[in-house]
């Protein structure tokens, strides 16, 4: 799947499908509201694509996120072969831009004890790199949710000279970094293109799109600040709907337009 936005051809690559236990979902209004949101859902998991994106533009090949690589087993890492099949070799990638420091977005940067993309700068949101490099911040989360700190340490060890902290704002021609905090402190989306036709790659603003677009109060246990993640989700959906931007992200199954539907929203699938 690919579309042109401004100076860039944007292509989506699916690294695998994450089967999240239903128990990992939460709702800002409690258990009854979550049960209502899940009414009609079958099964004990919710399935979500794990995506990364290639931007082909004036400065060569860039990636938004890098998938899991081989770190999470054979169910993941498929984006690597898909990129090669599309003519993108690891050495062709000149820059990888992360939405945030979580394994399904950043572990694909690493191949054993070396960088997988040998010629790439790695752009990391400043606030995420600062948070996940902080021993004090680590103490604020339970052990089961400290993986980002271990990952940041690995990135600094293996890819340290390649890392480039980036602020929000314009980071390249037709690429704007937008703060979208909540899932992580430095969680960042990227607005690609110019004029009327733009694409917002919003990382993990939504995880379970069919549930959360109808009820943005549904959250995910790995949102570090669930209240802020909810507010960010509402703002992102509203802004995309009002501006007519296409959207995709770390776990959406394609490219979509957002439309208002009463007090909520809906997705309209877009062709590649």
Question: Model regions: which residues?
Answer:
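Conserved beta-strand hairpin/beta-sheet module of binuclear metal-dependent hydrolase folds
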Residues: 2-86, 189-203
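Active-site metal-binding loops of divalent metal-dependent hydrolases
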Residues: 15-17, 66-69, 101, 127-128, ...
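A short acidic, glycine-rich active-site loop
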Residues: 36-46, 87, 146-150, 220-233
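Residue-level marker for buried hydrophobic side chains located in beta-strands
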Residues: 62-64, 97, 122, 199-201, ...
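Active-site metal-binding motif and surrounding structural segment of the metallo-beta-lactamase
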Residues: 74-123
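Metallo-beta-lactamase
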Residues: 77, 84-85, 92, 126-179, ...
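Histidine-centered catalytic micro-motifs
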Residues: 96-106, 180-187, 248-253
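Cap/insert and terminal regions of metallo-dependent hydrolase folds
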Residues: 196-272
């Amino acid at each position: 799947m690919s579309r042109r936005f401004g100076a860039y051809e944007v292509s989506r690559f699916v690294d695998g499908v994450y089967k999240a236990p239903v128990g990992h979902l939460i709702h800002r209004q409690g258990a009854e509201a979550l049960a209502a949101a899940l009414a009609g859902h079958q099964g004990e998991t919710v399935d979500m694509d794990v995506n990364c994106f290639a931007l082909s533009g004036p400065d060569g090949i860039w990636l938004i996120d890098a998938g899991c690589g081989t770190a999470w087993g054979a169910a993941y890492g498929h984006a690597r072969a898909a990129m090669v099949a599309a003519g993108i070799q690891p050495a062709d990638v000149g820059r990888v831009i992360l939405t945030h420091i979580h394994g399904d977005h950043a572990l694909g940067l690493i191949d054993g004890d070396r960088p997988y993309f040998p010629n790439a700068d790695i752009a990391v949101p400043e606030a995420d790199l600062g948070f996940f490099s902080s021993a004090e911040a680590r103490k604020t989360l339970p052990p089961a949710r400290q993986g980002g700190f271990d990952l940041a340490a690995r990135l600094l060890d293996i890819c340290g000279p390649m890392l480039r902290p980036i602020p929000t704002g314009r980071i390249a021609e037709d690429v704007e970094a937008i703060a979208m905090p909540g899932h992580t402190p430095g969680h960042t989306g990227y607005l690609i293109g110019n004029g009327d036709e733009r694409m917002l790659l919003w990382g993990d603003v939504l995880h379970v799109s069919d549930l959360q677009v109808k009820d943005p109060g549904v959250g995910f246990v790995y949102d570090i600040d669930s209240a802020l993640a909810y507010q960010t989700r509402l703002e992102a959906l509203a802004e995309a709907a009002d501006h007519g931007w296409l959207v995709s992200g770390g776990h959406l199954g394609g490219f979509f337009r957002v439309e208002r539907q009463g007090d909520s929203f809906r997705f309209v699938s877009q062709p590649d």
